[in-house]
Amino acid sequence: VVTIDHVFNNRMAILSDNVNGLQALVRCAYANGHRRIAFIHGERTAVTENRLAGFYKTCAELGLEIPDAYVREGVYHDADRCAEETKFLLSLPQRPTCIIFPDDFSALGGYNAIAEAGLSIPEDISVMGYDGIYLSRVVKPELVTYQQDTTMLGRTAADKLIQMVEHPRITLAEQVLVTGKLLTGRSVKHI
């Protein structure tokens, strides 16, 4: 058995490098002058735990103290839930200057909540996504996002499965990390 983005004991797992993904997003926000960075993450899974670790680790390395209120639990691919979390963040006395969403689709909920509040992206608040789906390239303003390399995830999983079938006695269960890349857009303002 080969799994993608799920870890099971004694099973081959091909994983998107979620720690590196959040590090890239936080560093991009920081390089653009943001110090009040919020993160709406997905429900608690191994993927989420890695993303949270990447977020907190990078913030600590950069000397950023992130208030607990800036880290919110949303639901992956649920734009409405992420819109509600965005409204909460916007209601804070000292709101964040940048919000990282759990995925690009959920960021649409953030776009809507920000517009409903009479604010503009990126003039009033910056927004980042995760996944790098086609939608992130066509939404206005174009979303800054971390693109997972889904082609390499699939190819690596297929290669490992073939290896397991052809050489079952010498194939060891391992975890293989596949890195993605930061896609620039126009949703983050330099402050």
Language model segments and positions:
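Bacterial carbohydrate/catabolite-sensing allosteric modules
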Residues: 1-191
